[in-house]
């Protein structure tokens, strides 16, 4: 192999405390927004309508929280997970400055944990990634951990360091960029009359609708984020792999589930935090994705009576409607149809 090409990092290439500045900065355009909308059909009013966003004190319609996440995440793939077997989870994700078309995002990651697996062939790398805009304002930070192959199974194992991971992002750490006026908040345009006050802890919502994944669409979405993980693209190689076909990028499932959640959570303006997330089973083209959500917590935001926070678990399934809320069995094992277990916090207007 030429020394000028990049094979990606293997487990033994990572060092505790290592900082990685990822290529390439990305200016988000109106075209990116249009393509994202065409891929997922998101109907949330905040990111669809500039007048609606302006009624909440913003200058115009912002970039969808998850489009920000995917672009920040995509920057990390060539350095962190090009040789990954699996992306294992997320924690401590916090959205910061509002992102608008024309903003340029870049990402830096720090290795905060390493643990070699017992087989000696792989290890788990924990990274804290930070995305910033052109003014170095943090737009997103999160922790993720990923299982990565070793180049040499005989390479010595590093000292095991597993970081303490937060259970959730405290409400006091949430960025709340909106100001809601009951007189100006248009429930008809938002798509639902149900606000923060109308949800109860433990309430479960079947989002009803399903959407089938197309091969071209999931690959186009992954390219949109400049995510280069070969398992999503290279059928020539993956045909001989564990599944015999390309795997759908897990973030594609997150965005599909968020879009489906409009039916039941239409006033969830944006995602303020990612508390945890697991891709519990792989998804493939031809799978039909359904979703349901549970309200885990209702949180009043200190000093605010116009807006509150809901901690939500959204579960996505493949080829299985969610009228009976499939999740885990008595032993804690996931239903085989569950492909995503996503715990996040949304901002939602309160009744005046």
Curated annotation (Swiss-Prot):
Keywords: Carbon dioxide fixation, Lyase. It holds the Pfam family MC_hydratase. It comes from Chloroflexus aurantiacus (strain ATCC 29366 / DSM 635 / J-10-fl). One of its GO terms (biological process) is carbon fixation by 3-hydroxypropionate cycle. Residues 16-129 form the MaoC-like domain. Induction: Under autotrophic growth conditions. The lineage of its organism: Bacteria, Bacillati, Chloroflexota, Chloroflexia, Chloroflexales. Involved in the glyoxylate assimilation cycle used to regenerate acetyl-CoA and produce pyruvate as universal precursor for biosynthesis. Catalyzes the reversible dehydration of beta-methylmalyl-CoA ((2R,3S)-beta-methylmalyl-CoA) to yield mesaconyl-CoA (2-methylfumaryl-CoA). This is Beta-methylmalyl-CoA dehydratase.
